[in-house]
Structures are given as C-alpha cells and as structure tokens.
Amino acid sequence: MMINALRHIEKIGTELITFSDDMDGLRKVPENIPNDEILKKNLGKPLTAIPDPFGKYQSFAEHNNTMLKKFLKKFNFEFSFKSSTENYKNGTFNESLKRVAEKYDEIMNIILPTLRSERRKTYCPFLPLCPDTGKVLEIPMLNLEKETGKITFNNNGKKIQTNIYDG
C-alpha cells in the first residue's frame, strides 16, 4: 500500500527490496515441514547450509526464498530480492562491517543495555561460523583487530580466528 501511495507522488522513486536473512542459524523446526529430521540435525546452521527438506532446491533457504518470490509475484509486486548470504560473500556488506568494527565500543554501549542478562554475556555484532560444526555461534568475542577485520572467539576452549569480511 505504501509503495502505491509513493508512486502517485511523481518526484519520489520507489523500490521494494525483499531481504532474506538466510545466513541466520535455524533456531527451531517448523511443525509443518516434511522430513523434519533433516532440519533437526542442522539446527543452528545457516539456512543456506541446510538441505531442502522438500527435495526441490539446493538449500532450505533457497526453498523459502523461492516461495517468498512466488508469493510476491502472485500479487504483482515489483521487487528486488537480496540474500544476506550472497551479500556477505560478494563483499557488499564489507564497508558496513568495517564501520561496525570502527564503532564497536559505541555500538556495544547502545545494544547491551537493551538485552537480557544471559544474552548480554554472549552478544557480539559479528556471528562466526564454527569451523567444526558449521553452526552460527553466538559467543563473546575475545579480540577485534579493527584494521584487518580479524576477530577471535573462544568456542568451548578452542580459539577461533576469522575475518568479518567476505562472508
């Protein structure tokens, strides 16, 4: 409705951007999904790293993204589709990630007071993937090298070093 209203104002260009957070870790298994054992054994992994339980697409994310696009097309929405996985991997987010690194302390001072105490202990704006399990880790960061983008985490006694850039 908003886009239609804006289209009637000649000087305002509009674009509906549909953004998929398909890099998020799967938190729970939906009840209406076939082959739910596929999802159960992949809890915590990014949706793009989980096989499609319907068996039609490369990943559960591709299935969900395709369903979303079909729905929007059914109602004649004109839209641009963006995938967080693709944007991380192709470097689209690198400048923003650099800015988050530069402003890390300021960001933490704003975010931490809004979180429950348990999440406050583990919160970090950067969520690494565990190299052993492929799961999205929600663990506190030990070190951030702002110039290089290297970050270090402690994952159950094992130090993980990764880079915030390019996925």
Labelled PLM ranges:
Residues 1-108:
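N-terminal Rossmann-like or analogous alpha/beta NTP/dinucleotide-binding catalytic cores
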Residues 73, 77-167:
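Active-site cores that bind ATP or allylic diphosphates and position pyrophosphate for catalysis
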